[in-house]
Amino acid sequence: MKYNRFEELPVWQDAIELAVRVFELTTRASFRRYRSVRDQIERAAMSVSNNIAEGFERGTTQETLTFLYIARGSCGETRSILCLSERLPGLTHLRAEISDLKSKSESVSRQLRAWANSLQNTEIRGQRYLTEKSKRLSKQAREREEFLKELEEIRNRKS
């Protein structure tokens, strides 16, 4: 599937949901006494979606990959702070909610890894490298594939 805007990306949407849920957690009165933990986890959670967006907008596959790895690192940082939080004396009553957030973070991380793996194995260099010639060649290749698919369907109907 082709995405034109980062807001359409399922992984970006999940990363936004992760950040919103982290902010909902950190607005609890229990977090007031852990201000530095709160600030750090909020920054880390926001960084995930922001790096996905920045990488998507960069225009080259290599830059996208770089930012996906940064986003994945921020996802790990978020999860690490969640692990710390569930062990802090004033936050143990939030363990179930924190556990759900850790699962969400792991899901986002898996999506980022899968996307990065798919980009590593592609010959596509990114929008920045598209020329009129490369666009025309790409269009011709797609049309050829569609034509061959139609021929195959016709052959199958005759059989």
Where are these regions (language model features)?
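Amphipathic alpha-helical assembly/interaction segments
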Residues: 1-159
